C-alpha cells in the first residue's frame, strides 16, 4: 500500500512515517505540508491512500477532498484531526475514515488495513 502523508506539522509527519515504516506492505511515497503540494504529489504519485490532516493549510478541507477525488478517484482518504468535532464534518464530506490524532496508533493501522483488505 503506497501512502502519501499530508500534515503541516513536521513532527506529526515524522511520527507517522516512523509508525508506517514498521509495517510490512506499507510504503510512504511522499509528504506534503500544505494543500498545493499535496495535490501536485497526489497527481504525480497516485498513492493508494492519503492520510490527510483535516486542518491542512492552503484550502478548506472539504474542497481539498473534492479536488483529490476528481483527480484520482481510486485513492482512499483517511482524515486526521485533533478536533473531535471534525469527525462528523470529515465523514459528511466523504472521507473513507476518520482517526483522531489522540487515538492510539493501532486505530489508524486498523483503518488502513481495513482498506487494504477491501481493496484486495
Label every model-predicted segment.
Residues 7, 53-54:
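Active-site residues of response regulator receiver
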Residues 10-30:
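Two-component/phosphorelay signaling modules centered on CheY-like receiver
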Residues 31-49:
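Acidic, metal-coordinating helix/loop segments flanking the phosphotransfer/catalytic sites
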Residues 34, 60-63:
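Acidic catalytic/metal-coordinating carboxylates
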Residues 62-73:
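Short amphipathic alpha-helix used as the core "switch/output" element in two-component signaling
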Residues 63, 82-99, 103, 107-110:
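Alpha4 helix (beta4-alpha4-beta5 surface) of REC/receiver domains from two-component response regulators
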Residues 78-80:
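Hydrophobic/aromatic residues positioned on beta-strands within the core alpha/beta folds
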Residues 113-120:
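The C-terminal output helix
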Amino acid at each position: 500500500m503506497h501512502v502519501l502523508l499530508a500534515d503541516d506539522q513536521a513532527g506529526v509527519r515524522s511520527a507517522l512515517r516512523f509508525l508506517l515504516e514498521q509495517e510490512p506492505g506499507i510504503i510512504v511515497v511522499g509528504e506534503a505540508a500544505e494543500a498545493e503540494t499535496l495535490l501536485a504529489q497526489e497527481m504525480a504519485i497516485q498513492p493508494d491512500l492519503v492520510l490527510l490532516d483535516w486542518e491542512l493549510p492552503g484550502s478548506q478541507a472539504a474542497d481539498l477532498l473534492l479536488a483529490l477525488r476528481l483527480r484520482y478517484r481510486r485513492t482512499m482518504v483517511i482524515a486526521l484531526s485533533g478536533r473531535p468535532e471534525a469527525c462528523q464534518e470529515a465523514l459528511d464530506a466523504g472521507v473513507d475514515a476518520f482517526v483522531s490524532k489522540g487515538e492510539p496508533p493501532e486505530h489508524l493501522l486498523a483503518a488502513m488495513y481495513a482498506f487494504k483488505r477491501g481493496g484486495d
